[in-house]
Amino acid sequence: MELHLTPRLKQRPAQAAACERYVDRLPVSSELRSELLADPSMPASAGISIDPRDAQAAIEQLQSRLSAREPAKGETPEPGGSTYGSVGRRFSLAYGNPQVAGEPLLKRRPDGTVHVDTGPEPQRSSMVPRQWPPHIVTGWVRNTWRRMLGRPPVPETWDTLHDGPDAEGKWHPAGSHRRWFLLGLVVAQTTLATYFMTKVLPYHGADLLEIAILVLFAVLFSWVSAGFWTAMMGFLVLAKGGDRHLISRSAAPDAPLAPDARTAVIMPICNEDVTRVFAGLRATYESLGRTGHLANFDFIVLSDSGNPDLRTAEVDAWMEVCRAVGGFGRIFYRWRRHRVKRKTGNVADFCRRWGSKYRYMVVLDADSVMSGDCLATLVRLMEANPGAGIIQTSPLAVGRETLYARVQQFATRVYGPLFTAGLHYWQLGESHYWGHNAIIRVKPFMEHCALAPLPGRGPLSGEILSHDFVEAALMRRAGWGVWIAYDLHGSYEELPPNLLDEVKRDRRWCQGNLMNFRLWLKQGFHMVHRAVFLTGIMAYLSAPLWFLFLLLSTAMLARHALVPPEYFTQPYQLFPTWPEWHPEKALALFSATATLLFLPKVASILLLVRQARQYGGLPRLVMSMLIEVVLSALLAPTRMLFHTKFVIAAYSGWGISWKSPPREDAETTWGEAVRRHGSHTLLGLAWGALVYWLNPSFVLWLLPIVGSLALSIPLSVMLSRVSFGRASREAGLFMIPEEALPPREIVETQQHVEQATETPNFVDAVVDPVTNALMCATASARVVQPASAKERHAALVQHALTGGPRALTASQRHILLGDPFALSKLHELVWGSPLADAGWKNIRLLVRRAPNVLPLRPRVA
């Protein structure tokens, strides 16, 4: 918030100046201001000598006047004192008297306390995780042994969980045939490529080193082949206009929503950019309001923020958004005191408190934005498909301006539809769930998707990090379908702004996927979701495998350069084995592999020829694709080293910290780039020098790897620049339709961000009369407290008063924010006590300037 010094502070008596400064921070009329300050004990003339302690008495009297009632003689005073008694009046002066279902938002309780409910009325139910089933082999051995002993097999509790109506849907035979076809394509293509690889090697796979190279090549090539055929089938599906099993075609686009199809739009957040979070939430809410279906939805922000400043800002932002859109009773907020199990615990806490009130829930990320039409369509699809447990949208990446992010937005927008359509083609109703921008059927989710910790010790045990794949597998195990509505429009997200922020996110995902792989052979899961676990780990395990493949290839080169050839490799061999080098075969195999990587991108361009104008025109679209291919090749070795490090770290027991990703266009500094990429540069230079020393002609083969590593520092810095991103947009490169013609929801989100004022923090919650009233009203007031708790809180108030804001830890600040009596008492003391630390006094000397944008404060009383 913008602050300035008040002009009324010159030569005023201590108690009068304090009261004037206090009233100046309240949105009151001049008449009410005069009424509050009119008191014989607060003279207006200067130069009168008054005991400084009178300032505290004057503040107390001012609080009594604000509370609009003076306690009669012998009457029990307001709980928490006169300052707490003024909370309701201060709240009403600032925010008016909002109504929720005909009742005032600010409720006055019989015990004298006031409270603002920020969440829905609780309707508690249970959500209990089940123990993980045994390994397939373990279960088979155990039951086989029991049969040999004449005992019945142990009943499998998870076999009784198939209560979903879509255990074997009409789509299942088609899906089974398609997956076998995919497996055949991958195996055939990998076998052929591995055969040609044996012809490239000098001894054709006759020694251990070459056998190891062949094994790694087969694994890596099969991974590339699976991606290639997924994209190709996606191309065919999109070219012919869609799949006949497409779930988005199962409901009429204008079908009315049933009144009992109650849906909660939940947004779990943790230490996020508050302005961006509530701007996106507001844009989504307003878009839904334009559809006329707002009555079916509630919006709930679920905060796990551990920063007291952000907690204060979130409550203030919730209030302002509700006032701006009339969202009281529709938009809710909850701050979780016991922040356990990260996002899964936050969602589970929602399910236990309010899940039984809703049939569906839509999960959003902190950077998610969805259109009202998309939300309404998701509910229609759920209603039309009673066997669907999860329907995942394919969110479009928008909103970033760095060159790196714009390239990634272009890639996901142009190539992404091929891969998501291909995934849908193979998976159908046994698909992915990505944790956000998806709708979930609440009842089966609560019954089957509670996550038990993984047994054991170490970083790959305990609470599951990457919960989404596991929840999809559990939902499908129970007989409910999991679908991707890849052609559904109106779902948006944001990407990391630079390479280093992307790999920070990848480290969390890497460890989460490695943990999930422990469930790969657990009993009860469907084969498709076993494949999902496998592809999840291969997304990161392929990096160290590729690195090892390159190291072994370098070792083979060193052996042939430094060690005399061995012509007799087998006992009693009659004829020598001559090493053969066939550069033309190696080039052909390299070209074939590059084609598998490059052809899906060309196919994507072919699909967009008619829409090329939305991408800057066909020439710029093709140029953008070519530049993206080059940049991807340059970044691939750096990503390889990062992912290799993450895999090694996970298996070595190195812990990770789970921090929220940046929600703004953060640029990489040269210092950070040197720290993070310095070892990559040295490795690239040393590796290239070694190969040149061994055989100069082989440097060209390795140049794309070592050259990229040598350039990793400037590449990382330059790609993170916003100026380069904007220049590329002005040149018409990396354009996407959402930039050429931005959706209304994205435009409004940006407008709300730009119009927002500075958010309040913990110090404002203590000092500012309005923010203090808001935080006191939204906290839970407990009139009856143990004497020990009262003593601790009273001591904390004195410690905060004399020590100032810097003397308080985060946990102490949260204690004060959670106790409205202590918070209001500290508020009174920092205004009136001579013992107040200078940190409080400096803030107290400032007056909030009236905001000039959204109506953050109502008209004066």
From Swiss-Prot:
InterPro entries, A to Z: Glucans_biosynth_gluTrFase_H, Glyco_trans_2-like, Glycosyltr_2/OpgH_subfam, Nucleotide-diphossugar_trans
Cellular compartments annotated: Cell inner membrane
Keywords: Cell inner membrane, Cell membrane, Glycosyltransferase, Membrane, Transferase, Transmembrane, Transmembrane helix
Main EC class the enzyme belongs to: transferase
Gene Ontology MF: a single term: hexosyltransferase activity
Highest taxon of source: Bacteria
Biased composition, class Basic and acidic residues, residue ranges: 67-76, 105-114
Pathway in which the depicted protein is active: Glycan metabolism; osmoregulated periplasmic glucan (OPG) biosynthesis
Membrane topology, from the record: Multi-pass membrane protein
Any Pfam family the entry gives: Glyco_trans_2_3
Transmembrane segments: 181-201, 208-228, 532-552, 589-609, 616-636, 698-718
A Gene Ontology cellular-component term: plasma membrane
Disordered: annotated span: 65-89, 101-129
Gene Ontology biological process terms, A to Z: glucan biosynthetic process
The protein's Enzyme Commission number: 2.4.1.-
This protein's record includes keyword RNA-binding: no
Main location: membrane
Similarity section: Belongs to the glycosyltransferase 2 family. OpgH subfamily.
Known role: Involved in the biosynthesis of osmoregulated periplasmic glucans (OPGs).
NCBIfam families: PRK05454.1-1, PRK05454.2-1, PRK05454.2-5
Name this polypeptide is given: Glucans biosynthesis glucosyltransferase H
Organism of provenance: Cupriavidus pinatubonensis (strain JMP 134 / LMG 1197)
GN (gene name): opgH
